[in-house]
């Protein structure tokens, strides 16, 4: 269950960068086990002791660094739940590349639930990239249920770029984001479903601080008899700006329900 094999390499080339290597700041989780990890001078990764997951500490001196935290599940019948916390100090500038790929050639469900929390201090800039992908000719389902919590301090910025490439039978995404004064948020969700697949995204963005802003964009393709639901909600509690955009291409007998909501 803990071996790095050709399937692992193929999935990493899709959800991370081509020719993923054990360099820089990284942690590779494979079938519920951390295969390898590494630190840099300004990025430290520590495994939690009370539950599965890790704490990632990013120094304010980190400028232009990239952190890789991919997950691969390729043994049928695995349910993997992981809790990851990212602590980004004031002034840091960092890219975090996440994502999960599932290969299922068996008859049992493969499932990964990633609970990610980002604690972003003043004037820090974060780009978060997440790709989800499924493959395999087994009858077992490939399920991904991510939960993302983001807390933005004054003058910080966060770009969240997510993509569900293909092959995920069921996904339920829950996202909660809080913005303080002059914090900036951009969310881009790209999603593709086919066959009988289903996808649900619920997102709540609370703008507590004056001059905070949020842009939320969803672009999706639905094929076959797949079903998608996208429900983003922007809540303004101060002078702020919010924009929500939902674009879909609907094919065959697929269904898409977009419910953009602004409450201010």
Label for each model-derived stretch:
Residues 1-49:
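Short, Gly/Pro- and small/polar-rich lid/capping loops
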